[in-house]
UniProtKB/Swiss-Prot annotation:
Main location: membrane
Compartment annotation: Cell inner membrane
NCBIfam families linked: PRK02237.1
Membrane topology: Multi-pass membrane protein
Regions crossing the membrane: 4-24, 30-50, 59-79, 86-106
Species the sequence originates in: Rhizobium etli (strain ATCC 51251 / DSM 11541 / JCM 21823 / NBRC 15573 / CFN 42)
Sequence similarity: Belongs to the UPF0060 family.
The protein's name in its UniProt record: UPF0060 membrane protein RHE_CH01408
Length: 106
């Protein structure tokens, strides 16, 4: 269930950040900020649903998912194919996130 929450959180975070990017860098109208802010609020709320007692650990584990989701956004939304360094780096980050997420803790 945690990975599903992280996946949805990533979509909302990336969409929210992209709304700001589009407004500032792509000269989209200011109304793009409203759905961006809503999306970022949903992202933050979703992370509170992760079953963890430590926010920092939750955010660190989420980081690997965020990187893979960002590379997917690069490919699917922006139309730029990730290169081998993007993919390799993403896999390394996902491995690190998995260690954080699945480590046995008392």
């Amino acid at each position: 269930m945690t990975y599903i929450i992280y996946a949805f959180a990533a979509v909302f975070e990336i969409a929210g950040c992209f709304a700001f990017w589009a407004w500032l860098k792509l000269e989209k109208p200011a109304w793009w900020l409203a759905p961006g802010m809503i999306s970022l609020a949903l992202f933050a709320w979703l992370l509170t649903l992760v079953p963890s007692d430590a926010a920092g650990r939750t955010f660190a584990a989420y980081g690997g998912i965020y990187i893979l989701a960002s590379l997917s956004w690069l490919w699917l939304i922006e139309g730029r194919v990730p290169d081998r360094y993007d993919i390799g780096g993403g896999l390394i980050c996902l491995a690190g996130a998995s260690v954080i997420l699945f480590a046995p803790r008392a």
